[in-house]
Curated annotation (Swiss-Prot):
The active site is at H174. This is Probable malate dehydrogenase. Catalyzes the reversible oxidation of malate to oxaloacetate. Its EC number is 1.1.1.37.
């Protein structure tokens, strides 16, 4: 499998490193405009391949001709979110970068699986869909797996249990309007309503929603290890067939038409295979509906 990673910053290089460790691709192309950064990353990554004695070809380059016939393209270029900055404020900054890169990829690969890792993922995915560069089922954005990991982590920490005993799901946008699906969340096969009252769940929601901001505050840059791990989980699901939360273009599901929204879905090299139907509670439906109206996905 050939995977191209666009952007050799913290997220992109972490993804490339994880691809090596998990042996997901036998050919990796890392693209960036910063030659010094590329040189350093190529040394680090190729020496990692040598240390692990793996049969993986890796190339770090500015030249998009080397991306030809990529099976998967992971877009992680653009500006990272700063302390106090919303994901929405990033949209204008990162839109032109993404569209330019997507057009260059299109010149050498007709219709790869294109996964957006750059924020704001949902709205960048909308823009990419509207551009018509790639088919709608082949464009996806990663965020739900990361948010769900934060949900699992915070719930396990709050209840002092192992994360492996916790099962969580969420849908919606990769921002403060995400919907943690309480009705599908369980600990040791028991719904979390048996462990948390409404106030405690609201506190948990806040911790999950501020997960990224907490990293930015203390690290002075956006998270990158957990996002890279979430991306790898998505790629490995292509083989496992498991449902994972991800932002996809909907065509009527959840009442959304031709817009990107985080849902539980199954992924293949051919794109989105299946979207999970979910029996949401009235409260969960109301939260989702309000967010759809807020972002003008629906009229009031």
């Amino acid at each position: 499998m050939k995977i191209t990673v666009i952007g050799a910053g913290n997220v992109g290089s972490s993804v490339a490193y994880a691809l090596i460790l998990r042996e997901i691709a036998n050919e990796i192309v890392l693209v960036d405009i910063n030659e010094d950064l590329l040189y350093a990353k190529e040394l680090e990554l190729t020496q990692s391949i040598a240390a692990l004695n793996l049969n993986i070809d890796l190339l770090c380059t500015k030249d998009y001709t080397h991306t030809k016939n990529s099976d998967i393209v992971l877009f992680s270029a653009g500006f990272a979110r700063k302390d106090g900055q919303s994901r929405e404020e990033l949209l204008q900054l990162n839109t032109s970068i993404m569209l330019d890169c997507a057009k260059k990829i299109k010149d050498f690969t007709e219709d790869p699986l294109f996964i957006i890792l750059t924020n704001p993922v949902d709205f960048l995915l909308n823009t990419l869909y509207e551009s018509g560069i790639f088919s709608s089922k082949k464009i996806i954005a990663m965020a739900g797996v990361l948010d769900n990991a934060r949900f699992k982590y915070e719930l396990a920490k709050k209840l002092n249990v192992k994360m492996s005993r916790v099962d969580t799901r969420l849908i919606g946008f990769h921002n403060d309007d995400m919907v943690l699906v309480k009705s599908y969340a369980s600990v040791k096969n028991k719904n979390i309503s048996e462990f948390l009252n409404e106030e405690e769940f609201e506190d948990l929601e806040n911790e999950v929603k501020t997960g990224g901001a907490k990293v930015i505050k203390h690290l002075k840059t956006s998270a990158y290890l957990a996002p890279a791990s979430a991306c790898i989980r998505m790629l490995e699901s292509i083989r496992s067939g498991e449902f994972l939360p991800m932002s996809v273009i909907l065509h009527g599901e959840f009442g959304v038409q031709n817009k990107a929204l985080g849902v539980m879905a199954r992924l293949g090299l051919e794109g989105v295979i299946e979207i999970m139907k979910m029996d949401l509670s009235l409260q969960e439906k109301d939260k989702l509906e309000k967010s759809l109206i807020k972002y003008q996905y629906k009229g009031e």
